[in-house]
Amino acid sequence: MKQPVFAVTSGEPAGIGPDICLDLAFARLPCRCAVLGDKHLLRARAEALGKSVVLRDFDPESGGAAYGELEVLHIPAVEAVEAGKLNPANAAYVLQLLDTALAGISDGIFDGIVTAPLHKGIINDARASTGFFSGHTEYLAEKSGTGQVVMMLAGKDLRVALVTTHLPLKDVAAAITQPLIESVARILHHDLKHKFGIKNPKILVAGLNPHAGEGGHLGHEETDTIIPALENLRREGINLAGPYPADTLFQPFMLEGADAVLAMYHDQGLPVLKYHSFGQGVNITLGLPFIRTSVDHGTALDLAATGRADSGSLITAVETAVEMARGSL
């Protein structure tokens, strides 16, 4: 089988993205990784970290990099980069990394995209007049013409997808509708089957309220919205269980045999996942017409060029992308 080729965007240049990308040169991965970024920045960061990395220009027709080598698709930064110090002038550079990766997907050069962290605040500071930048997920969805995507984080033996993502807690209940639950669950079911190769994925669903509403005594979202949605989905042949109280759902005996958990909101599901797998977790965007994985952490500006950044999540993100490429065959 031909090795998959992934675009790895190096993210915010002042953060740890370049640092952790350099470690891919020493990770024995069953794929090719083309790091998208400024090769002069990568070289300078390698020197600052004392890492002996040979940078090679990425060539789709070549055989790939040897151990200690890193394939780089050079995209110049707008201005010089100082580790740990954000510069709005380089926000356009960060977005150009994503646009170049998307173009490579369209041209059949890349089999997927793996993203190092970017800094949403500095991008919004730089493009205040051109609209709010929500993040990687929304940007890739918009640019690829994808109407709906689903955020899923994965760690060892645990996958957690979200019905709602970055919403204030006061807005969550109103946002959870029967059509939304059904569409999110369908995307989750489809991608578990077709991108992870799971024939009949079992999905556990969390309730919204304490004790999953206690039969309507602690809220009506379960009886009025969540349960009817699950009944419709089961009639379609989707293997769902729940809704369960979130405080018992994540116990090992409950998770046994489950392929994913569907949580209603961000801080219901992700604290458990991050406690379970922080540093080895992966952010996966479901619903896109291509594979996209990412690290589960931010830019960590204070760690840039210090040698204290952990590349474990990035390496796991690449390994997960390989798993998905194989599962989609």
UniProtKB/Swiss-Prot annotation:
EC number: 1.1.1.262
GO cellular component: cytoplasm
Superkingdom: Bacteria
InterPro entries documented for this protein: PdxA, PdxA_fam
Record: residues binding a divalent metal cation: H166, H211, H266
Entry GO MF terms: 4-hydroxythreonine-4-phosphate dehydrogenase activity; cobalt ion binding; magnesium ion binding; NAD binding; zinc ion binding
Swiss-Prot/TrEMBL keywords: Cobalt, Cytoplasm, Magnesium, Metal-binding, NAD, NADP, Oxidoreductase, Pyridoxine biosynthesis, Zinc
Localization in the cell: Cytoplasm
Residues annotated for substrate binding in this entry: H136, T137, K274, N283, R292
The keyword Iron-sulfur is assigned to this record: no
Pathway stated in the Swiss-Prot or TrEMBL entry: Cofactor biosynthesis; pyridoxine 5'-phosphate biosynthesis; pyridoxine 5'-phosphate from D-erythrose 4-phosphate: step 4/5
A Pfam cross-reference name: PdxA
Reactions mediated catalytically: 4-(phosphooxy)-L-threonine + NAD(+) = 3-amino-2-oxopropyl phosphate + CO2 + NADH
UniProt main location, coarse: cytoplasm
Residues spanning the signal sequence: none
Cofactor descriptive note: Binds 1 divalent metal cation per subunit. Can use ions such as Zn(2+), Mg(2+) or Co(2+).
Cofactor: Zn(2+); Mg(2+); Co(2+)
Assigned protein family: Belongs to the PdxA family.
Other facts: The active site is located at the dimer interface.
Free-text function comment from the UniProt entry: Catalyzes the NAD(P)-dependent oxidation of 4-(phosphooxy)-L-threonine (HTP) into 2-amino-3-oxo-4-(phosphooxy)butyric acid which spontaneously decarboxylates to form 3-amino-2-oxopropyl phosphate (AHAP).
Oligomeric form and interacting partners: Homodimer.
HAMAP family assigned: PdxA
Descriptive protein name: 4-hydroxythreonine-4-phosphate dehydrogenase
Organism of provenance: Neisseria meningitidis serogroup A / serotype 4A (strain DSM 15465 / Z2491)
Lineage of producing organism: Bacteria, Pseudomonadati, Pseudomonadota, Betaproteobacteria, Neisseriales
Gene that produces this protein: pdxA
